[in-house]
């Protein structure tokens, strides 16, 4: 028997960030990273949409690239103090990954990080909150996956947490959020998406459900990544879709040795290195 899991709702297309105003709840905590969403005005838009939905909103800002165990614990503590019924994570892979782990510690304060490092060993989530993810880069696809990557810097180990429980309930894949991406970031996140799709296609767990997604993503990356790199906005929108398709594929077919090697090697270099190494 095999399992195929995706978010309940995936909204895509320019301007779909507005779907936040249709979420049903009382309190939302919005988890973001280093400030690009604030500078570009998307953070304010998201806050206003959530308030339009009738929710009280609290921010948790400053999630670093390659988020640490310490950041996860701080975020979970903030969630326990605020009591949200929606966790909304917006940004690159780091704030979304961090928020997924925060979610587990928010709902289960007594669980240990070591417990969560055991693949597919998460407790049943959604006891207190649901999860919405909004990517601002076109590579990680964590908005549709059952994975979260958290780093224990004291041990020098990057841990991939894996459980279908942390697949978001809602993914908002708004291409407007990636229009201002620097060309270099377009390139390395695009190669990350390509690697996700290829690894899913050659995975020993690939199947008739994952192969079409992987193949479509591969074709789209070849068709649109060069133009996206040069600043073509239609190509950039298509790359945002392609990376999401790749995520749907690899979340269910899983990945292989390429990502295993990248997680180890990138600790020696910059936060960008993992995506670049994935595509080598």
Task: Give the role of each language-model region.
Residues 1-86:
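ATP/NTP phosphate-donor binding region
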Residues 48, 77, 104, 108, ...:
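Short, well-ordered alpha-helices that flank and scaffold nucleotide-derived cofactor binding pockets
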Residues 64, 90-92, 254-257:
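Active-site nucleophile and cofactor-binding loops and adjacent substrate-binding regions
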Residues 70-77, 81-173:
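Glycine/threonine-rich beta-strand-loop-alpha-helix active-site module
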Residues 139, 245-268:
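Glycine-rich phosphate/pyrophosphate-binding beta-alpha loops
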Residues 147-253:
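Carboxylate- and glycine-rich phosphate/diphosphate-binding segment that chelates Mg2+/Mn2+
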Residues 269-276:
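Conserved small/polar residues in nucleotide/adenosyl-binding loops
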């Amino acid at each position: 028997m095999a399992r195929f899991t995706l978010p309940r709702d995936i909204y895509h297309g320019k301007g779909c960030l507005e779907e936040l105003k249709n979420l049903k709840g009382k309190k939302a905590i919005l988890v973001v990273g280093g400030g690009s969403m604030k500078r570009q005005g998307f953070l304010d838009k998201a806050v206003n949409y959530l308030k339009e939905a009738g929710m009280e909103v609290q921010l948790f800002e400053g999630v670093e690239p390659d988020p640490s165990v310490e950041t996860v614990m701080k975020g979970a503590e903030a969630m326990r103090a605020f009591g949200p019924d929606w966790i909304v994570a917006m940004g690159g892979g780091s704030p979304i990954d961090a928020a997924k782990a925060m979610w587990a510690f928010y709902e289960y304060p007594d669980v240990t990080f070591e417990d969560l490092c055991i693949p597919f060993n998460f407790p049943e989530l959604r006891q207190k909150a649901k999860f919405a993810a909004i990517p601002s880069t076109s590579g990680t696809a964590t908005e549709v996956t059952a994975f979260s990557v958290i780093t224990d810097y004291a041990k020098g180990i990057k841990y991939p947490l894996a459980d279908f429980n942390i697949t978001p309930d809602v993914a908002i894949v708004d291409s407007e959020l990636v229009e201002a991406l620097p060309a270099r970031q377009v390139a390395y996140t695009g190669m990350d998406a390509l690697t996700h799709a290829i690894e899913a296609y050659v995975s020993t767990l690939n199947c008739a459900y994952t192969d079409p997604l992987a193949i479509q993503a591969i074709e789209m990356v070849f068709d649109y990544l060069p133009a996206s790199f040069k600043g073509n906005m239609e190509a950039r929108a298509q790359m945002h879709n392609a990376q999401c398709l790749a995520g749907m594929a690899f979340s269910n077919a899983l990945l292989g040795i390429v990502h295993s090697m990248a997680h180890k090697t990138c600790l020696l270099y910059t936060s960008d290195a993992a995506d670049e190494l994935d595509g080598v």
